[in-house]
């Protein structure tokens, strides 16, 4: 009985090694949460490049206005 369990455990470890399980240290950092923690909003971040849309006529219905 024990040899069957040992063989089954060996086969399972060969097919699915423990190194295939993702650990918390393998996860990428959340840069957005890190920026918000530093107090820099995404709109004020130096890498943020907003697209400016301006209206040529009166600014009644366009957003954002110049």
From Swiss-Prot:
Which Pfam families does the UniProt entry name for this protein?
A: Conotoxin
Please list the tissues where expression of this protein has been recorded.
Answer: Expressed by the venom duct.
Cysteines engaged in disulfide bonds, as pairs: 54-66, 55-62, 59-65
State the InterPro entries in the record: Conotoxin
GO cellular component terms, alphabetically, are: extracellular region
Propeptide residue range(s): 21-53
The lineage's top-level taxon is: Eukaryota
Q: Which GO terms describe its molecular function?
A: ion channel inhibitor activity; toxin activity
Q: Which residues carry this modification: 4-hydroxyproline?
A: 64
Signal peptide interval: 1-20
Report the locations given in the UniProt record: Secreted
Record keywords, A-Z: Cleavage on pair of basic residues, Disulfide bond, Hydroxylation, Secreted, Signal, Toxin
The UniProt similarity line reads:
Belongs to the conotoxin M superfamily.
Task: Reproduce the free-text note on domains from the UniProt record.
Answer: The cysteine framework is III (CC-C-C-CC). Classified in the M-2 branch, since 2 residues stand between the fourth and the fifth cysteine residues.
Question: What is the protein's given name?
Answer: Conotoxin Lt3.5
The species is Conus litteratus (Lettered cone)
